[in-house]
Amino acid sequence: MKKLFFISFFLIASCSKSGDLVMSKNAKDIIGNNNYPAISYGGYRGKSREVQPSIVDIKEDLKIMFAQGFRVIRTYDLHHPFAENTLKAISELKNSDSDFEMYVMLGAWIQCKDAFTDVPIHNEEDLEGNKVEIAEAVRLAQDYQDIVKVIAVGNEAMVHWATSYHLEPKYILKWVKYLQDLKINGTINNNIWITSSDNFASWGGGSEEYHNDDLDELIRSVDYVSMHTYAFHDTYYNPVFWNLSGDLEDLSKKDIIKKAIQKAVEYELSQFNSVQEYIHGIDSS
């Protein structure tokens, strides 16, 4: 059965550069494992990505996340030094502390032609930029085999509300298949899982405008589906979601919050279930 995992934004054996001993955990051991909580990680201190956090800054963050129990982090792009510096920081922490454990879901940013301009071309890809992102993902997956366990092709690159950069599923599919071929020929570790990080609608759980043969083939081609759902952020479009019904007015503040959280969980599970239903109609294996 095709594995499906969701990221909720309601809350928020070889040698490599990172050491001589490759950790035994693979993607199949950590993804979906409650003992390996994951969190998306940016690490930026300023208002612009042009101001990059130092490796010292990143180490500070990693120690905090490790102390909180997180064991997997997700990054977003590779056209800034941040992702590689994060891998360097993890490697250095591992080498200085044998108890430190952290894995990475490495995001490769994929976008359409003329993204972030006044006239993005959504039916074409930014070929040169996307090639650089994928090449960097491959290089880092080779250099940090003990840390990089997942490569995610695109971050919310297919959902239509990403008006500045979204593109058609066929381009995500192309790069997913390319990476799967590299696993087969031994260029990258065969145990790395390949996916795409995207909104529930993009994975078939929304309207029929997203349903097409390329999406269906993408579902068959990824190692698992990484689905995003965000009860909090979605209320930008649906602010009445958090309005109190009359039967809650007499409850304590704690009970009101508890019911609001439960409502959000149910909201996210409904999106998960809609994607799961679509996926099982495509690939029941």
Regions found by a protein language model. Give the residues of each.
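Noncatalytic carbohydrate-binding groove/subsite architecture in carbohydrate-active enzymes
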Residues: 127, 158, 164-285
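C-terminal motif of bacterial Sec signal peptides marking the signal peptidase cleavage site
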Residues: 13-14
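Substrate-binding cleft of extracellular glycoside hydrolase catalytic domains
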Residues: 23, 78, 84-192
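Catalytic domains of carbohydrate-active enzymes, especially glycoside hydrolases
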Residues: 57-81
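Hydrophobic faces of well-ordered beta-strands that scaffold small-molecule active sites
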Residues: 37-41, 73-75, 102-106, 149-153, ...
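Acidic-and-aromatic substrate-binding clefts and catalytic sites of carbohydrate-active enzymes
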Residues: 51-52, 74-85, 112-115, 127-130, ...
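Alpha-helical scaffolding within the catalytic cores
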Residues: 22-26, 60, 132-139, 200-216
